[in-house]
Amino acid sequence: LLWAIVFASPPTFAATTTVAEPPPVLVTGANRGLGYVWAKKYAERGWNVIATARRPADAAQLRALAGTHPRLRIELLDATDAASIDQLGTRLAGQPIDILVNNVGMLGEEDEQRLGSLDASRFDTYMRVNALSALLVTERLLPNIRAGKQKKIAGISAVVASFAAYPRIHSGLY
């Protein structure tokens, strides 16, 4: 449904048209999964795509996409690290962002989430990523979003965020 909301109004230009300034979009977690698909779709439509990855050097598929879409650039972002979020904001100072796609989420190992074998440090990381990181990224990039024309924020997640849809999880700790 969210895909339909963000893409309901297609860009006002065709991919073959010359546009003075295509819209800018930032996609977090663009190195794989849904984030990669979103970054790819926006790049194919001619948008200026800022695609973030926790480990850009390991994001071979995303780097290949950037090689075929010159309007796609890759930025380092570790959404679990406040300093990394702040550094991204500093690097993007003055850069308008029309759409921010917050694509974050991690599941972790089942045995780290059970009473009796809880790894508190890892669980803290899961909670920080799943519950707080999108908010922190949005907060830091708010000036960029306000400077954009569309001013849209999309929050997406995969099945890892739904325990009902992922029955193998035995994580009463959530």
Cite the ranges covered by each PLM segment:
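Catalytic loop of short-chain dehydrogenase/reductase
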Residues: M106-L107, R114-M127, R146-Y174
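Conserved Rossmann-fold cofactor-binding substructure of NAD(P)-dependent oxidoreductases
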Residues: A79-Q95
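Rossmann-fold cofactor-recognition segment
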Residues: A66-A83
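Conserved glycine-rich cofactor-binding loop
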Residues: N31
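A short, exposed helix-loop element centered on a Lys and neighboring polar residues
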Residues: T138-E139
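Conserved hydrophobic beta-strands of the Rossmann-like cofactor-binding core
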Residues: P24-V27, L100-V101
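Conserved glycine-rich Rossmann-like NAD(P)H-binding loop of the short-chain dehydrogenase/reductase
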Residues: R45-Q61
